[in-house]
Amino acid sequence: MTQQEPRGEPGARAPETQVLELVILVGLQASGKSTFFRERFAATHGHVSKDLIRNNKNRNRRQRKLVEAALRAGRSVVVDNTNPTVEDRRPLVELGRGFGARVVGYHFDSETRGCLARNARREGRARVPDVAIFATAKRLVPPSRAEGFDELYRVRPDGQIFEVRAR
């Protein structure tokens, strides 16, 4: 939350306002990103996930349009995808910056073995091929503040809870 000074009244403070946020989740499939969204952000942020855009030929373009629409409407939004590389995250960070949003990253620092086990418990479309998890693990580059994040956190699943630490 931020405080703003009203025009014409030096030193006066406006009521607290909600800061526009673009939250970017980064991690392997089945690392807990969607569960984390539901627990931490569902009540306050929009949700954009390529998993929900299955039939679209250009999911990246559709994702960008959905994020842009939320930010343009003044709504904070979470991008819930693997976002494994700097190149995958860069357009999102730039988009958030363009709207003056605070860009926050959550890196899900999960072991591949744990993700495979959680994935095996999934059913239907929620389950991804194991090869997809291995492929993402090979490409995954942990995010850094140098990419333009205002805040960056490391998330580790710990049983039924998430351990979140600033990076």
Each predicted region: which residue ranges?
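Mid-chain, well-packed structural core segment of small domains
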Residues: 85-118
